[in-house]
From Swiss-Prot:
GO CC terms: cytosol
Name the record gives this protein: Ribosome maturation factor RimP
Disulfide linkage: none
Role this protein plays: Required for maturation of 30S ribosomal subunits.
Organism: Acidithiobacillus ferrooxidans (strain ATCC 53993 / BNL-5-31)
Amino acid sequence: MVNVEDRLYEGIAQQAGIAGCTLVDARMVRTGRAVALQVFIEKDETTAVTIEDCAAVSRQLSLWLDVENPIHGAYRLEVSSPGLDRPLKNLHDFERFKGSQAEIHLHGLTQGRRRLQGELLGVEDQKIVLKNAEGRWTFALDDIHKARLVPQW
């Protein structure tokens, strides 16, 4: 997967906002010869994303993408909610989902570990705090390659 360039990401966030939603994540995904721009949105912390929200963001983004033309070549636009295993992208996300189970992949090794799973304890002194059976872990946001919620069934 290729991360969407910052300029494109900011434009997508702005267009999602115009349509009444917040951008959670955006990425370019290549499968064989096909390329998709995947956009994940949310409404707010208490309102679920509807198909109408996805359609509104898709329409707004399509207009903007046609005018700005930031992506060269053919691609498919996909707009959806982030799902139960949503990515955690910023300190606000880690604080918001305090008490939830999360999986964190680090850029490098921390005490011999690159991947950790446990309960999010939130953010303390600009550091993300996670607790699992092995103990309490703290990370700077820059140490994290990717993180996501782990749904509990």
